[in-house]
Amino acid sequence: MSFHPALIIVDVQNDFVHPVYISSGESALEVVPVINRLLENDYKWDTVIATKDVHPKDHLSFTTSHSSTPKPSGTVVNIEAYGHVYKQTLWNSHCVENTPGCEFPDSLNGDRIEFVIPKGSDRLVESYSGFYDAIGRDNGLKAILDKKGITDVFIAGVATDICVKETALHARHWYNTYIISEAVKGSSTESHNQAIKDFRDAKIEVISEKDPILQSVRKV
């Protein structure tokens, strides 16, 4: 049986992981050394892909984008875009294009990242998943994986309960999908734990860094 593994690094950006930038929740900087180990040359990935939130400053997922008085973070609103209406949770401003918070942390060894998938760049439409945005438009990730002949997808990054989860739930339809437990962090401990349960319920494997299937990437 063929085995063609890809590493997908989800949204490891300063606004999500670095305590200097992060405005709410817990720092997730601890996942970076784990991801760096996965990026060492003895791991024979067929490709390494990073997703990246890249929002305009007036993105409609931001609390400040709906009235002169910002709505509280966590408020759910209906957004109309291109003939679709979707529900959107509002967040504090984050990962605004051309700001330091949008960039990968300096401590991330990005030399092996072959492709970067930007998402959320349309001010009207959020995109948690690396595969599709909130109204089902294609972000281009699947085309890259299929062109590379990928069979197995290993996912790291943040947040376990949001963008990691949505990316994994899409990936499972086409690839053997694995969440590397030490390499993901949630927006809270409770939401992280619930996401791990949701992965297992969806038949997505949650593995450790030492799992034989991950170690086999070194032997491809």
From Swiss-Prot:
Zn(2+) binds at residues 53, 55, 94. One of its GO terms (molecular function) is nicotinamidase activity. One of its GO terms (biological process) is nicotinate nucleotide salvage. It catalyses: nicotinamide + H2O = nicotinate + NH4(+). Keywords: Cytoplasm, Hydrolase, Metal-binding, Nucleus, Peroxisome, Pyridine nucleotide biosynthesis, Zinc. It is found in: Cytoplasm; Nucleus; Peroxisome. Pathway: Cofactor biosynthesis; nicotinate biosynthesis; nicotinate from nicotinamide: step 1/1. It is an enzyme of class 3 (hydrolase). InterPro entries: Isochorismatase-like_dom, Isochorismatase-like_sf, Isochorismatase_Nicotinamidase. Its main location: cytoplasm. One of its GO terms (cellular component) is peroxisome. Its EC number is 3.5.1.19. The active site is at residues 11, 119, 163. Belongs to the isochorismatase family. Catalyzes the deamidation of nicotinamide, an early step in the NAD(+) salvage pathway. This is Nicotinamidase. It comes from Schizosaccharomyces pombe (strain 972 / ATCC 24843) (Fission yeast).
